[in-house]
C-alpha cells in the first residue's frame, strides 16, 4: 500500500529519488496507468470530475459578474458605451506611486482599475442586463450552480450513485440526450431569453423577476403560433434609425430574417439571432429523436457504420469495427471532441469580428483584437491535443484484428502516401511563399519596389463577389444587380446583407490584395507543416521501418540507444512536442495578419498594410517594431503611463519564453552534473546543511525537460503577444 505521494502508484511511491515527485505529477491524470484502476471506475472518475470542471467555470464566471458589479462601472458604461472604458476590477497594489494611481484611475472612477478587454460588458448589455443588481443576481445564481455541481460530483463518487459501465457506453441514448437536451433545449432556452428579456430591453423595456410574467414579448401573444400565422412574428421589425436600448423607432417583431447589422450598434439584429437559435433548437430536438433506444424505432449506430462499405468492394470494409473501437477508446472520443472544439473556437474567433453579435463591440478595437487572438490560440492548443490523443489511441487502444481492412487499418497501410503528400504540399508552399517574399525584400532593399512580384487573389475576390461584394467588378451572382439571386435577396431573404457586405464600417468581407495573398499562403504553409508533423506522429505511433515495435515503448520514450540506428525524437510525444512549435508559429502568423490589417483599417490607413505586407522587412519594421514602441515606452526615466503594466508583462513574458531554451537546448547530463555540484555545496554549507531531504535529487528525463522547455516557450510566447496586441491597440485607440 502506497503511503507517500503518489498514492496511485506503488512503484513510484517507493522510488528513493526525486523522480517520485516529478513522475507522480506527470502521471496524476493518466488514470489508465494507476494501480487497481478498472475500466468502470476509470469512467466513473472522469464523469465525476466533469462536475468539478463545471463548478470551476461557474465560480470563475460568477467572479467576473461580482467584481464588475462591485468595482466596475457597468451602469455608467451603459449610458455611453462608445466613450466610457469598461472596468474589469479595482487594483490594490502597494507598489503604486502617485503617478500610477493617477494613470490607472480610468473609466470615470477615482481609484486604479483594470480595463475589461473581454467583451463581457457588451454581452451583458446585449442580453438585457441594465443594473449592477442584475450582475449581483447573476453572480449569486452561478455560485449556487457551482455548489450544486460540486455536490453532484461528490454524489456520483458514492457507490449508490456511480453509473455503470453500460450506461457510459449507451451511445444512442447519450447522443439523443445530448442532441435534444444539451444543444436543442439549451438553444430553445436561449431563444426564449432573447425574446422575453433581451429584445424588450433593446427597445427600452427592462425585464426583471418583478415584471417577467406580466410583460408579453409580442402584442399578439401565442395566437400566431397556434393559428399557424408564424410570419406575424416577423412583421414590423426595428427601424434602421432605432436607438438601441430605447423605444425610439423600435418595432414589434421578435423573429426576423433581416441580415446585416443594426446601423447604430453595428451588431447583428437581436431578432435575427433569436430566429437563428429557434431554428437550431428545432433541428437538434428532431435530431435527438433519431437513434434507437426504448421503442425499437430509429437508427442503430452500429448498423449505420457496418453498412458504410465502398460499393465496389475494392476499398476495404469501410466503417466495420469502428463502433466497438470508438466505444471502447476514451482517447479516440477525446480526440474527436478536441478536434470539434478546436474548429468551433477558431470559428468563434472568425465570427466575433466579422459578424459581431454584441452591441457596440465592433467599436471596441482592443476587445476585438484580444478576443480574436484568444480564441485562435485556444483553437491551436485544442487541435494539437486532438492529434496527441489520436496518437495515444493508436498506441494503447487500437486493435489490428478488430479493425482488419477498415478505414483505420487502410489509413495505416498507406501512411507513406499520406505523409509524403503532406510533405510535398508543405515544401511547395514553403519554397514558393518564401521565394516570393524574399524576392520582394531584395528588390525593395535595392530601391526597385516596382519590381516586386504582386499577385492579386482573383479566386478569393471572385468568391467574395459571388457573396455580393461589388468592389472588384466581377458581375456574378450577388455582385450582379440583374441576377435572380440578387432579386431574391431583396424580397425573400436577408434584405440588409448586400448593404452590409459593401459597407466599410464593418469587417464582414475585407478588401484583399497581394499582401493578403502572400500571408494566406504563409498561414497555409504553417497549417500543412503542423498537420504533417502531427499526422506523421500518429500514423507512426505504433511502429515504423526504423522501429517496428515502437508501440511497446508507449506514447513517450526518450531514446532507444544507438543500436537501433538512433531512435531519439521518434516517439508520438516528440511529434506533439514539435507540432506545438509549428502550431504557435502558424497562430502567430494568423494573429499578426489579422491585427495589422485591422489596426490600419481602424486608423483609416489601409494602404500601410497593402504596401508593406508584401515583403518580410515590412512585417518586421512596420508591424512588429513600429507597434512595439508604446510598450517599450510604457515606463522610462521620465515616468510611466497606463500601458506600463503591459510593458512590464511584455518584458517578463520574453524572459519566460527565453528560459524555455535553457531546458530545450541542454539535456539530462548537464543537469545531473549541476545537481550533483549543488548537492555537494549544500551539504558543506553551514546552516543550509541543517536542511536535508529523503529523496535523492536526480535530473529530469529528456522528455520531462523538453516538456518544461515547451511550457516555458509556449506560455512566454503567448503572453508576449498578448501584451503586445493589447498595448499596441490600446495605445492607439484608448
UniProtKB/Swiss-Prot annotation:
Could you tell me the superkingdom of the organism this chain comes from? Eukaryota
Q: Does this UniProt record's set of keywords contain Transferase?
A: no
Q: Using the record, list the residue span of the signal peptide; answer none if the entry has no such feature.
A: none
The residues the record assigns to binding chlorophyll a B3 are 662, 670
- Write down the chemical reaction(s) this protein catalyses: reduced [plastocyanin] + hnu + oxidized [2Fe-2S]-[ferredoxin] = oxidized [plastocyanin] + reduced [2Fe-2S]-[ferredoxin]
- Annotated localization: Plastid, Chloroplast thylakoid membrane
Q: Which SUPFAM superfamilies match?
A: Photosystem I subunits PsaA/PsaB
Primary role: PsaA and PsaB bind P700, the primary electron donor of photosystem I (PSI), as well as the electron acceptors A0, A1 and FX. PSI is a plastocyanin/cytochrome c6-ferredoxin oxidoreductase, converting photonic excitation into a charge separation, which transfers an electron from the donor P700 chlorophyll pair to the spectroscopically characterized acceptors A0, A1, FX, FA and FB in turn. Oxidized P700 is reduced on the lumenal side of the thylakoid membrane by plastocyanin or cytochrome c6.
The alphabetical list of record keywords is:
4Fe-4S, Chlorophyll, Chloroplast, Chromophore, Electron transport, Iron, Iron-sulfur, Magnesium, Membrane, Metal-binding, Oxidoreductase, Photosynthesis, Photosystem I, Plastid, Thylakoid, Transmembrane, Transmembrane helix, Transport
Any idea of its EC number? 1.97.1.12
Chain sites annotated for binding phylloquinone: 671
Q: Give the originating organism.
A: Cyanidium caldarium
| Regions that span the bilayer | 46-69, 135-158, 175-199, 273-291, 330-353, 369-395, 417-439, 517-535, 575-596, 643-665, 707-727
Q: How does it assemble?
A: The PsaA/B heterodimer binds the P700 chlorophyll special pair and subsequent electron acceptors. PSI consists of a core antenna complex that captures photons, and an electron transfer chain that converts photonic excitation into a charge separation. The eukaryotic PSI reaction center is composed of at least 11 subunits.
What's the name of its gene?
psaB
The cellular component terms of Gene Ontology attached to this UniProt record, alphabetical and capped at eight, are:
chloroplast thylakoid membrane; photosystem I
Report the protein name in the record: Photosystem I P700 chlorophyll a apoprotein A2
The family annotation for this protein states:
Belongs to the PsaA/PsaB family.
- Keyword Nuclease set for record: no
The disulfide bonds in this chain are none
The entry's free-text remark on the cofactor is: P700 is a chlorophyll a/chlorophyll a' dimer, A0 is one or more chlorophyll a, A1 is one or both phylloquinones and FX is a shared 4Fe-4S iron-sulfur center.
Amino acid at each position: 500500500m502506497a503511503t507517500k505521494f503518489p498514492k496511485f502508484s506503488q512503484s513510484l511511491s517507493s522510488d528513493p529519488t526525486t523522480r517520485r515527485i516529478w513522475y507522480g505529477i506527470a502521471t496524476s491524470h493518466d488514470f489508465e496507468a494507476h494501480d487497481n484502476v478498472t475500466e468502470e471506475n476509470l469512467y466513473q472518475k472522469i464523469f465525476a470530475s466533469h462536475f468539478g470542471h463545471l463548478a470551476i467555470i461557474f465560480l470563475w464566471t460568477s467572479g467576473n459578474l461580482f467584481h464588475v458589479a462591485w468595482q466596475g462601472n457597468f451602469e455608467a458604461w451603459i449610458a455611453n458605451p462608445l466613450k466610457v472604458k469598461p472596468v474589469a476590477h479595482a487594483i490594490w497594489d502597494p507598489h503604486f506611486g502617485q503617478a500610477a494611481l493617477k494613470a490607472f484611475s480610468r473609466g470615470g472612477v477615482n481609484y486604479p482599475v483594470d480595463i475589461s478587454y473581454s467583451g463581457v460588458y457588451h454581452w451583458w448589455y446585449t442580453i438585457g442586463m441594465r443594473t449592477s443588481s442584475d450582475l449581483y443576481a447573476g453572480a449569486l445564481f452561478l455560485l449556487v450552480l457551482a455548489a450544486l455541481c460540486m455536490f453532484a460530483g461528490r454524489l456520483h463518487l458514492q457507490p449508490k450513485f456511480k453509473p455503470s459501465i453500460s450506461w457510459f457506453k449507451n451511445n444512442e441514448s447519450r447522443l439523443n440526450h445530448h442532441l435534444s437536451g444539451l444543444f436543442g433545449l439549451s438553444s430553445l432556452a436561449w431563444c426564449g431569453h432573447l425574446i422575453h428579456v433581451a429584445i424588450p430591453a433593446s427597445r427600452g423595456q427592462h425585464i426583471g423577476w418583478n415584471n417577467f410574467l406580466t410583460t408579453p414579448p409580442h402584442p399578439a401573444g401565442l395566437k400566431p403560433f397556434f393559428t399557424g400565422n408564424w410570419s406575424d412574428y416577423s412583421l414590423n421589425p426595428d427601424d434602421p434609425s432605432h436607438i438601441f436600448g430605447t423605444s425610439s423607432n423600435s418595432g414589434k417583431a421578435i423573429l426576423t430574417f433581416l441580415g446585416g447589422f443594426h446601423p447604430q450598434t453595428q451588431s447583428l439584429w437581436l431578432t435575427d439571432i433569436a430566429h437563428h437559435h429557434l431554428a437550431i433548437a428545432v433541428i437538434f430536438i428532431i435530431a435527438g429523436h433519431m437513434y434507437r433506444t426504448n421503442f425499437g424505432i430509429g437508427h442503430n449506430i452500429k448498423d449505420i457504420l457496418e453498412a458504410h462499405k465502398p460499393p465496389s468492394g475494392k476499398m476495404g470494409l469501410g466503417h466495420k469495427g469502428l463502433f466497438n473501437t470508438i466505444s471502447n477508446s476514451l482517447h479516440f472520443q477525446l480526440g474527436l471532441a478536441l478536434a470539434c472544439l478546436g474548429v468551433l473556437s477558431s470559428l468563434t474567433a472568425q465570427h466575433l469580428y466579422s459578424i459581431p453579435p454584441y452591441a457596440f463591440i465592433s467599436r471596441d478595437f482592443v476587445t476585438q483584437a484580444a478576443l480574436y487572438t484568444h480564441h485562435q490560440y485556444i483553437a491551436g492548443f485544442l487541435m494539437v491535443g486532438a492529434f496527441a490523443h489520436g496518437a495515444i489511441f493508436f498506441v494503447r487502444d487500437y486493435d489490428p484484428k478488430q479493425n482488419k481492412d477498415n478505414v483505420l487499418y487502410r489509413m495505416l497501410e498507406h501512411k507513406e502516401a499520406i505523409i509524403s503528400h503532406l510533405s510535398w504540399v508543405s515544401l511547395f508552399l514553403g519554397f514558393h511563399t518564401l521565394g516570393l517574399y524574399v524576392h520582394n525584400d531584395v528588390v525593395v532593399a535595392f530601391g526597385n519596389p516596382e519590381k516586386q512580384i504582386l499577385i492579386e487573389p482573383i479566386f478569393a475576390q471572385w468568391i467574395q463577389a459571388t457573396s455580393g461584394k461589388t468592389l472588384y467588378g466581377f458581375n456574378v451572382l450577388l455582385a450582379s444587380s440583374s441576377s435572380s439571386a440578387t432579386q431574391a435577396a431583396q424580397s425573400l431573404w436577408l434584405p440588409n446583407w448586400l448593404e452590409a457586405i459593401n459597407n466599410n464600417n464593418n469587417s464582414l468581407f475585407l478588401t484583399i490584395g497581394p499582401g493578403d495573398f502572400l500571408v494566406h499562403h504563409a498561414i497555409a504553409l504553417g497549417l500543412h507543416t503542423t498537420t504533417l508533423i502531427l499526422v506523421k506522429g500518429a500514423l507512426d505511433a505504433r511502429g515504423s521501418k526504423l522501429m517496428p515495435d515502437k508501440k511497446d515503448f508507449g506514447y513517450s520514450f526518450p531514446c532507444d540507444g544507438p543500436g537501433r540506428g538512433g531512435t531519439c525524437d521518434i516517439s508520438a510525444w516528440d511529434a506533439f512536442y514539435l507540432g506545438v512549435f509549428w502550431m504557435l508559429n502558424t497562430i502567430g502568423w494568423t494573429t499578426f495578419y489579422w491585427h495589422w490589417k485591422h489596426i490600419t483599417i481602424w486608423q483609416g490607413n489601409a494602404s500601410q498594410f497593402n504596401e508593406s505586407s508584401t515583403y518580410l522587412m515590412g512585417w518586421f519594421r512596420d508591424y512588429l517594431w513600429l507597434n512595439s514602441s508604446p510598450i517599450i515606452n510604457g515606463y522610462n526615466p521620465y515616468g510611466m503611463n497606463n500601458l506600463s503594466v503591459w510593458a512590464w508583462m511584455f518584458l517578463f513574458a520574453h524572459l519566460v519564453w527565453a528560459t524555455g531554451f535553457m531546458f530545450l537546448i541542454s539535456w539530462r547530463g548537464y543537469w545531473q552534473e549541476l545537481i550533483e555540484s549543488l548537492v555537494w555545496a549544500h551539504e558543506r554549507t553551514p546552516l543550509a546543511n541543517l536542511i536535508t531531504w529523503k529523496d535523492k535529487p536526480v535530473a529530469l528525463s529528456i522528455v520531462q525537460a523538453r516538456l518544461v522547455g515547451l511550457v516555458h516557450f509556449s506560455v512566454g510566447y503567448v503572453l508576449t503577444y498578448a501584451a503586445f496586441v493589447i498595448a499596441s491597440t490600446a495605445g492607439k485607440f484608448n
